[in-house]
UniProtKB/Swiss-Prot annotation:
GO terms for cellular component: extracellular region. Pfam families: Toxin_35. It is found in: Secreted. Residues 21-26 form a propeptide. InterPro entries: Spider_toxin_CSTX_knottin. Its main location: secreted. GO terms for molecular function: toxin activity. Belongs to the neurotoxin 19 (CSTX) family. 08 (U8-Lctx) subfamily. The keyword Cell wall biogenesis/degradation does not apply. Residues 1-20 form the signal peptide. Contains 4 disulfide bonds. Transmembrane segments: none annotated. This is U8-lycotoxin-Ls1i.
Length: 77
């Protein structure tokens, strides 16, 4: 009985370790890539910055991009 419990705990530890390792190896998103569905996946020097899209005053969507931290983007006409 103790052997079964010990084996179960060891298997659980191995599976947990594999999952953590897979999360750490996940590729980060480079600059200007869309991060709407994955805001935490931008590379370390970038931040996921989101903007609302409007048409005739009504919100029609949202776009998010991996952009440099601390940089301010202004609209050009």
């Amino acid at each position: 009985m103790k052997l079964i419990i010990f084996t179960g705990l060891v298997l659980f530890a191995i599976v947990s370790l594999i999952e953590v390792q897979a999360d750490n190896e996940r590729a980060c998103l480079p600059q200007y890539q869309v991060c709407t569905e994955a805001p935490g996946n931008c590379c370390s020097n970038l931040v996921c910055d989101c903007y609302g899209r409007y048409k005739s005053g009504a919100r029609i969507g949202r776009n998010c991009f991996c952009l440099q931290k601390g940089v301010i983007y202004k609209r050009e006409n």
